[in-house]
Swiss-Prot record:
InterPro entries the record matches: FAD-bd, FAD-dep_Monooxygenase_BioMet, FAD/NAD-bd_sf
One example of a Gene Ontology biological process annotation: terpenoid biosynthetic process
Record GO terms (molecular function): FAD binding; monooxygenase activity
Function: FAD-dependent monooxygenase; part of the gene cluster that mediates the biosynthesis of the meroterpenoids arthripenoids. The pathway begins with the HR-PKS atnH that catalyzes two chain-extension steps to form a reduced triketide, which then primes the SAT domain in the NR-PKS atnG to initiate three more cycles of extension to give a linear hexaketide corresponding to the polyketide part of arthripenoids.
Organism: Arthrinium sp
Xref: Pfam families: FAD_binding_3
Keyword tags: FAD, Flavoprotein, Membrane, Monooxygenase, Oxidoreductase, Transmembrane, Transmembrane helix
Family: Belongs to the paxM FAD-dependent monooxygenase family.
Protein's name in the database: FAD-dependent monooxygenase atnJ
Phenotype when the gene is knocked out: Abolishes the production of arthripenoids but leads to the accumulation of new product which has no double bond in the side chain.
Region (Disordered): 371-392
PANTHER family: HYDROXYLASE, PUTATIVE (AFU_ORTHOLOGUE AFUA_2G04330)-RELATED, MONOOXYGENASE
EC identifiers of the protein: 1.-.-.-
Length: 421
């Protein structure tokens, strides 16, 4: 991504609904380019929720260029690559090192949000209002309507209010808002290094700069270190047994997790045994690609228009690309009359790419969750044959496709073409 931040020619007042990673990323990008930003967040306090996320190298560099993360930030762990193992024996199937685009960076979701919040608060042209719940938007007037009756006007409203977006229904037709259950859920927990030190196998998982993935029938598990190797992040995707909810606060008994992974690799079972008595259990839904991202001067951004399943780890990256694109086009317009063109360029430069990634993410789970048999054996044989060669098709090709995208450059070219037309 381009690190050049052109100062805007037409300063705008932008209202952002939601102080998640997408909303805060957009706020920082816009403020760095000279726009004034008001963030309206429904919660009265930003809690330290979620688990680990893996930032592609372009996303990490973008955060550094925007003053959010430091090159040597201790909240981060640069990952050398990922090791994929057999679900039951733990046999190494393939090892894929970082490709020429760079290394992924592992960081806790809460740490990422707090770093963004700290940067936003450093910027004098950003205001954050907590406990400000937006219930509607007046599309014609570009006014956000709050639960307490307040009306907040702006030149532009960005709906970055997440997977359960209130404002998506104002921009998209009703059928685009209804989520479909995937039949899968995710257990998530983190383990402090102190719990792992006494076991050599577990200690290695947290001290090495590598991710590990176990792929098995209808399930897969990912583990990697966080916070300068002081935490181990563990995510376990499994069939939804009806116990989960679409909420970060939904939990289940640890014994249910152990039962779901009975017969899996003993190293993994030791990790689960160390988990808290109650383990977060998040139900996963499939959200159809939003057919429209822009209506009037209100736009969708991040999960509100393209909520991602976790199979390719693209949720944060695509929200950051959205933030980059909208900040780029708004900083290039020369008159307010060009704002509609800028918003068209934002959607046009982003939608096709995001739709393709959403579809690829859904397809990826089929390869991850193959049952024991010929198809699984063929997959693992191909992985072994390409291990260490840089040609592992299900990892390296994804990196080449997703990790080298120039969201700013594409947005700039799209806007230029619209202006000329």
């Amino acid at each position: 991504m381009s690190t050049t931040k052109p100062i805007c020619l037409v300063p705008l007042h932008v209202v952002i609904v939601g102080a998640g990673i997408g909303g805060l990323s957009a706020a920082v990008a816009l403020a760095n380019r000279g726009h004034s930003v008001l963030i309206l967040e429904s919660t009265s306090e930003l809690s330290h929720v979620g688990a680990g996320v893996a930032l592609p190298p372009t996303t990490r560099k973008w955060y550094e260029s925007e003053g959010v993360l430091q090159v040597d930030d201790t909240a981060c762990v640069p990952l050398e690559g990922i090791e994929i193992t057999k679900w039951d024996t733990g046999e190494l199937v393939t090892r894929t090192a970082a490709n020429p685009a760079g290394k992924q960076t592992a960081i806790h979701h809460g740490d990422m949000q707090l770093a963004l919040l700290a940067r936003a608060r450093e910027l004098t042209n950003v205001e954050i209002r907590l406990g400000a719940r937006v219930v509607d938007v007046d599309l014609e007037a570009t006014v956000a309507l709050l639960a307490d009756g307040q009306r907040v006007a702006g030149d532009l409203i960005i709906a970055a209010d997440g997977v359960k977006s209130t404002l998506k229904a104002k921009v998209c037709p009703p059928e685009a808002v209804v989520p479909l259950p995937t039949g899968e859920a995710a257990y998530r927990f983190t383990l402090p290094r102190e719990l792992l030190e006494s076991d050599a196998e577990l200690r290695e998982l947290v001290q090495r700069p590598w991710g590990v993935r176990w792929d098995g029938p209808s399930c897969h598990v990912v583990a990697y270190p966080l916070r300068n190797h002081r935490l181990l992040n563990v995510v376990l995707i499994h069939p939804d047994n009806g116990d989960a909810k679409e909420s970060w606060t939904s939990v289940t008994d640890k014994q249910n997790v152990l039962a779901d992974y009975q017969g899996w690799n003993p190293t993994l079972l030791k990790l689960i045994a160390l988990a808290p008595p109650e383990v977060p259990n998040f139900r996963m839904f499939l959200y159809s690609p939003a057919p429209v991202w822009v209506k009037g001067s209100t736009i969708l951004l991040g999960d509100s228009c393209h909520a991602m399943l976790p199979y390719l780890g693209q949720g944060v990256a695509q929200a950051v690309e959205d933030a980059t694109a909208i900040a780029t086009v708004l900083s290039l317009i020369e008159t307010r009359k060009q704002l509609p063109l800028a918003l068209r360029a934002y959607e046009s430069s982003r939608k096709e790419r995001v739709d393709q990634i959403q579809a690829a993410t859904y397809r990826a789970r089929e390869q991850l969750h193959l049952r024991d048999g010929d198809a699984q054996a063929a997959r693992d044989s191909q992985r072994k044959a390409t291990s260490g060669t840089g040609q592992n098709s299900d990892v390296v090709k994804m990196q080449q496709s997703y990790w080298t995208w120039d969201a700013a450059g594409v947005a700039e070219k799209t806007l230029a073409a619209l202006i000329i037309a």
